[in-house]
Curated annotation (Swiss-Prot):
Regulation: Formation and reversal of DNA-protein cross-link depends on DNA context. Catalyzes formation of the thiazolidine linkage in presence of abasic sites in single-stranded DNA. Mediates the reversal of the thiazolidine cross-link in presence of double stranded DNA.
InterPro entries hit by this protein: SRAP, SRAP-like
The enzyme's E.C. designation: 4.-.-.-, 3.4.-.-
Modified residues annotated as Thiazolidine linkage to a ring-opened DNA abasic site in this record: C2
Residues annotated as catalytic: C2 (nucleophile), E106
Gene source species: Bacillus subtilis (strain 168)
Lineage, uppermost ranks: Bacteria, Bacillati, Bacillota, Bacilli, Bacillales
UniProt superkingdom: Bacteria
Protein name: Abasic site processing protein YobE
Length: 219
């Protein structure tokens, strides 16, 4: 799964790397060493002409949901079953997004009683993009709430020693294809969702401190 990640890159770097044409005011971007579910997170969609940067709440709420609490159970979606699950089938065809990040965390189990936090990133330290889906939900007050989920896949060689799942990190080419609203074939879209090349990534143990620059330092 993916339950925590970081995004502390410069705002201008995000705009440039993801070819953003429309974006929220820079003052609404808050770098974080501990991006977590239920937070409003930076996301990118394509409207057919432009890449747009905005915020969606992390934890997808299907339109048919009667209670927003279901979002806490839907922070991730399995790549292999997107086309089969009612909550993900429709957004797979028409509501795809990417989530910028510069690393993510996972807990590695050493024994039945011991787990240690690991930080996983690109060796280049570059920004990358998680594959995601989004939806809109009518609240009980009649307001629209936009939410998202991060897609996971079987682990790479690097990740399999840490966890049995990993978030889908899109290559530059697949990132464009994933955002392209003209792509609607579920088989093709699912073919873009692959474990990222383990040779281009690294993982190391970090502190369990929350929302601190020290969280990303090797221990």
């Amino acid at each position: 799964m993916c339950g925590k990640f970081t995004l502390f890159s410069e705002f201008d770097d995000i705009i440039e790397q993801f070819n953003i044409d429309q974006f929220l005011p820079e003052g609404e971007y808050h770098p974080s060493y501990n991006v977590a579910p239920s937070q409003n997170i930076l996301t990118i969609i394509n409207d057919g002409s432009n890449n747009r940067l905005g915020k969606l709440r992390w934890g997808l709420i299907p339109p048919c949901a009667k209670d927003e609490k279901i979002g806490y159970k839907m922070i991730n979606a399995r790549a292999e079953t997107l086309a089969e699950k009612p909550s993900f089938r429709k957004p797979l065809g028409s509501k795809r997004c990417i989530i910028p990040a510069d690393s993510f965390y996972e807990w590695k189990r050493l024994d039945p009683k011991t787990k240690i936090p690991m930080r996983i990133k690109l060796k280049s330290s570059n920004l990358f993009a998680f594959a995601g889906l989004y939806e809109k939900w009518n609240t009980l007050e009649g307001n629209l709430l936009y939410t998202c989920t991060i897609i996971t896949i079987k682990p790479s060689e690097l990740m399999e020693d840490i966890h049995d799942r990993m978030p889908v990190i899109l290559t530059d080419e697949n990132k464009k294809e994933w955002l392209n609203p003209k792509n609607t074939d579920p088989d093709y879209l699912q073919s873009l969702l692959l474990p990222y090349d383990a040779d281009d990534m690294e993982a190391y143990q970090v502190s369990s401190l929350v929302n601190s620059p020290e969280l990303i330092e090797s221990h």
